[in-house]
Each structure stands twice: as structure tokens, then as C-alpha cells.
């Protein structure tokens, strides 16, 4: 795999260039909210240890650019705060068993003026079944476990989407053998300034499974 060049400049310049590289239109208000989100993540991280990533530049790449890379593919069809900022007409619910993470999401919903964003402090398997168009995971579980735990929250005709690193061939084989869900497509992602493999795994119920 060839190296991905870094993006020079300050956070605002790097964000603008990353959006251009992703062909993702982001107005001034959206960009301001995205930068405030990263600033608040840095502040909360000093006290609550939300993420092991400490370097502000790497936080920009691995938490912001990485999440932005899924916005356009999902619209053709991370996550969380970033999706709510970039797509105000989507209703986004973040589910996490770690209370400090859901508290942070709620704080961001208020601080950034995101009425379309909410957080549920629970485990996905403990939620009452929802009727979601899309359920997306990032660094969560194997494809089979993800489908087993989250599949009941997807409406008929809806989609499960897993954000992965390199294509997980063993997980795909295990999922297909189980028979309830099938991989519809695998979409490679290019994250600006990140020299690592990323892909989206799109899954739908197998015919006859509702």
C-alpha cells in the first residue's frame, strides 16, 4: 500500500483540505462545529480518558477525518457526532455501554446545537428493538456478532454497516455460513493523511429472513 501524504497547515486548513479530498461539501458552520467537537474531545480526554490518542494532530486524523470518510458512502446507501453535524436531516443515536462516552455525546449535542443527536447509555442488545434505516459500527465486534446483536434494530429493507480496517475475510465467511445476513458490498475508504486500510462492509438480511 502506498503512503498517504499528510495535510499541512493548522486544524481549520487541514479540515478544509480533507473535506475537499473526500469530495464532501462542508459549509463554514459545519466546519466550525467539527473543530469545536475535536477541541471538546481534547478537553474531556484530559479528565475522562475517552481515547488513547493524545496528539491533537492524530486526533484530527483518526477521529475526525476517519469518521468523515463514511459520510458520503452512507448517503449513497460514525460516526455519531460527525454524522449528526454533516447531515442535520438524519436522526442519529449513539449507543455505548461506557457512561463517560454517552455523557460526552450529550454534551456535544447541546454545545453544538444538534437536536438530531442523542445518546443511549446501554448495551445494544439491551435496547428495545428499533426501526432504523441504518445501524453502523466502528471498532465494535466481529461481523457475525454485530449482526446478531444489532440486526434486530434494522427495519425490513434496512442495512447494517461495519467500519473495518482491512477486509476481514474470515469474518465474512463466518457471517455467510450463519445464513441470516449477507454481505452486499465492500467499499474501500481513503482517509486523508492516514496511511492505513479502511473499508465499509454493507450487509442486508438474506432472503426469507425478516
UniProtKB/Swiss-Prot annotation:
Catalytic activity, EC: 2.1.1.170
Species of provenance: Bordetella bronchiseptica (strain ATCC BAA-588 / NCTC 13252 / RB50)
A single MF term (Gene Ontology): rRNA (guanine-N7-)-methyltransferase activity
Binding site for S-adenosyl-L-methionine: 78, 124-125, 138
GO cellular component terms, semicolon-separated: cytosol
HAMAP family in the record: 16SrRNA_methyltr_G
Gene: rsmG
Gene3D superfamilies: Vaccinia Virus protein VP39
Main subcellular location: cytoplasm
Top-level class of the enzyme under EC nomenclature: transferase
Keyword Transferase: yes
The reaction(s) this protein catalyses: guanosine(527) in 16S rRNA + S-adenosyl-L-methionine = N(7)-methylguanosine(527) in 16S rRNA + S-adenosyl-L-homocysteine
Function of the molecule: Specifically methylates the N7 position of guanine in position 527 of 16S rRNA.
Places the protein is found: Cytoplasm
Keywords: Cytoplasm, Methyltransferase, rRNA processing, S-adenosyl-L-methionine, Transferase
Protein family (similarity comment): Belongs to the methyltransferase superfamily. RNA methyltransferase RsmG family.
InterPro entries found in the cross-reference section: rRNA_ssu_MeTfrase_G (IPR003682), SAM-dependent_MTases_sf (IPR029063)
NCBIfam families: rsmG_gidB
Name this polypeptide is given: Ribosomal RNA small subunit methyltransferase G
